[in-house]
């Protein structure tokens, strides 16, 4: 028909739960859009949501909560060949000045993708002995995401008892990993 369908969803709205967001994502997937945008709710000064936050009738989604949920959503859309073209608000405009609460981070998508890699690495490593060093290969372009912002994923692997080196592999697809013993 000469056009593409792009849909948007928000997480962390009043009365929202992770389960409701997953249901929303499933409904969006059923519509077979070409693209999706996902925006965690943030609270800005001088808005009704700011009043609800102050009177206790609304609790803003934390950054960690939003990262965990949006990482799941990102994988859901990817598994259905739907491109997520935006994940989180970009800085600028009134966001920086009026921000009160909610999941706002200038590198929000990177945090979500880092979470995906961390969960995959920990899941695979949990099947292996902890007393040996490993090499974890990830897509070449995703080394930074796999290591995590400020190397948080590398630290988490170490805190879980795994000594790992993360290296690039140009033949792996997004979010795929390969673990071998470091000889």
Please place each PLM-identified region on the residue numbering.
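C-terminal scaffold of the Radical SAM
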Residues: 1-132
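Radical SAM enzyme core and accessory elements
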Residues: 93-183
């Amino acid at each position: 028909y000469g056009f593409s369908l792009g849909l948007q969803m928000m997480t962390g709205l009043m009365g929202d739960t992770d389960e409701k967001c997953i249901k929303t994502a499933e409904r969006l997937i059923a519509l077979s859009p070409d693209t999706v945008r996902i925006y965690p709710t943030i609270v800005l000064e001088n808005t009704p949501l700011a009043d609800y936050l102050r009177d206790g009738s609304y609790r803003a989604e934390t950054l960690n909560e939003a990262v965990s949920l949006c990482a799941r959503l990102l994988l859901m859309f990817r598994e259905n060949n739907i491109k997520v073209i935006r994940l989180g608000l970009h800085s600028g405009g009134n966001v920086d000045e009026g921000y009160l609460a909610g999941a706002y981070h200038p590198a929000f998508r990177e945090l979500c993708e880092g979470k995906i890699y961390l969960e995959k690495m920990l899941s695979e490593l949990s099947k292996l002995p902890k007393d040996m060093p490993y090499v974890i290969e990830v897509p070449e372009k995703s080394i930074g995401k796999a290591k995590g912002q400020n190397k948080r994923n590398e630290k988490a692997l170490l805190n879980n008892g795994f000594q790992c080196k993360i290296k690039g592999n140009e033949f792996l697809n997004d979010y795929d990993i390969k673990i071998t013993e470091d000889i």
